[in-house]
Amino acid sequence: MSAPVLVGVDGSAEGLAAVAVAAREARMRGTGLRIVHAFFWPMMRVPLEPSSMGPPEGGLRNQAEQLVAEAVRHAGEAEPGVAAEGAVVTGDTLPVMAEESRGAALAVVGSRGLGAFAGLLLGSTAVHLAAHGHCPVLVVRGAGDPAREGPVVAGVDGSAAGDAAIEFAFAEAALRGTGILAVHAWSPWKAEVPPPQDPAAPYASGAGDLAANEERLLAEALAGRQERYPDVPVDRRVLRGGPREALIEASREAALVVVGARGRGGFTGMLLGSVSQALLHHADCPVAVVRSQTARS
């Protein structure tokens, strides 16, 4: 069997919603589901190994195992044909989930869990895994409906991470039997104008020329993929404005939004760009963040 879909649980309602989404993703891929709960002593944040002392029915470790068992049952109810395994892994949530993602085809987490502070829009696990995961990371947002309908929205910006995101978006759309909405937003103040092939020709400077360049960027980013995925219809949108606003707006009609972890405008050293962070906080549907192969290694 191919690499499983990974999902993290913490006993929250958001965690169980993520399990249902992850189970559907596993079923579409024809693979298994690995459900993980990271366990540590909550007062001192010290990892707690199983103890030979005390009743087997008691203690926090047993509660953690029951939590995982309930998540496995929930996965079985959501997708009866998916083989789901549960594991209580000793350690803090952030490094445990990042390490577990090495062997996963996809990692799924809720947008917030029991550890989120009141008022926060996004939990630390979702942000950390999106930035450090070794596989694509799907953060469950919106109503958390596993069967939410609509196109897969792909954010296109011409970056290496964006290219990996487009590939993932096409594969995901094919699995779901839906189409792609490829969105590229640009600003005339940030547009990159390529030099003319003819040295004697003038540089593009008018709004029409700039728009044509952005249309070309989108076409080049999609080139070849429509041939590989002939059954996936593609709708293209080139919008003048900010990518964050454009993609958040597109998320209202989407089943999933897919973006690269960092785009062309990302600062060196940043693992998660402003667009992906904005979507993780404000999108109206689940968000998949894809890092380039170079960034994952």
Regions found by a protein language model. Give the residues of each.
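General small-molecule cofactor/ligand-binding pocket signal
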Residues: R34-V36, E85-V89, L138, V183, ...
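Structural beta-alpha unit
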Residues: M1-S2, E14, V21-R24, P55-G58, ...
